[in-house]
């Protein structure tokens, strides 16, 4: 009888705990849903003019395969860039940016130092990489492709970036900003970055294809 009473007590306690958890979890779900809801941002048209990259809120990054099983990501921390935006015809806009090779950062200083050597970028001889746009094509609503010349080391080759961009927003300091997101893939060996060892299973310890990722925030230049 005592065992029976204990079983009933445990069952009641378990039911109460489950009920409380359901109520609590339901509240958390509602709060969480409200917290992650996409903001209803009222963007405005991007005004024409010259824009500079806000380097504190922009990323020129990359990702490359390691041992054909994982990705190593990195970025260039010292860079600058300019966008000359044509509000009448986006395809007539111009983009250029440059990054200091010495500023490469993959989160591991020993690897960073190796990337700066002649095995890879040879920062002492070629201190900067740069991109200069040649044209922009529209590929649908809000979709564009940016074409241009990318120079790394002693090689300049044409590449293209599919990209999207936001409308403009005012910032707290009286400026106007908009964002650009772009991504493309290049072959590092096209730019004489050839270091790497073949793996017995196939492939290389450092992948040949490099994904280049741009997350750019541009602020309108102030009138001089």
List where the protein language model places each region.
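N-terminal secretory signal peptides that target proteins for export/translocation
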Residues: 1-9
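Bacterial N-terminal signal peptides
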Residues: 11-27
